[in-house]
Amino acid sequence: FPEADMPEGLIAFEAMGDGDRSFPSTPGDLFVMLKSSRIDLALEVGKYLILGFAPIADCVEDQRGFKYLDDRDLINFVDGTENPRGTERVAAVLVPSGTYAGGTHLLIQTYLDRQAEWNALTIEDQEGVIGRTKFDDIEIPDAEKKPFAHNVKSKVEIDGTEIKMFRQNRAIGTAKEHGTMFVGFAAEASTLTTSLRQMITADADGNYDHLLDFVTATTGAMYFVPPQAFLDAITG
């Protein structure tokens, strides 16, 4: 939409790094998510989308995500437990006012698991890295959490108030090579980038998100999902 104003706060995703940890930037112009219980139909629609856009755009990545067990990732922890619900989700995800009210910022990343290294940890150590119990998905009490736990370093707080995002992560890959596609929505892009910066950057005590010792980020891009009213207005 070259004649439309840029959504407030929309930024290109910039690569991040600290020590031997990195989040690469792999920009894209358009992200399409197809959701269906019929893999064959989703694939058919995807094929025609690629053909339809072929004169003006190249498909640079095509991932098939899937639900794994009881909404677990492929390191076998439940993913998305702390997602906001109901009206809290609406407040966390949707831009509240202005031209793009009802739209949302979207961050996409692909992570590949370093499974052998992860499997070498004891279950207790794995739970320390994640900040939740593995089998029954119970959050470890704050006083007992490791300062490098994933749910500590990825949490965004401003003046003591947690700023939520909504995740629709999906397991991806094969038995040989697999991981997670991070799909994060937020009312402000800064919520998403702040979370990543806290994860990857070691604090004054040297703590960063230790989950990054067991996964490798391979892609990263920021998008904006416009509200339906905006799409209706420009298409007439």
Describe these PLM feature segments.
Residues 1-236:
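Long, histidine/aromatic-enriched segments associated with O2/redox biology
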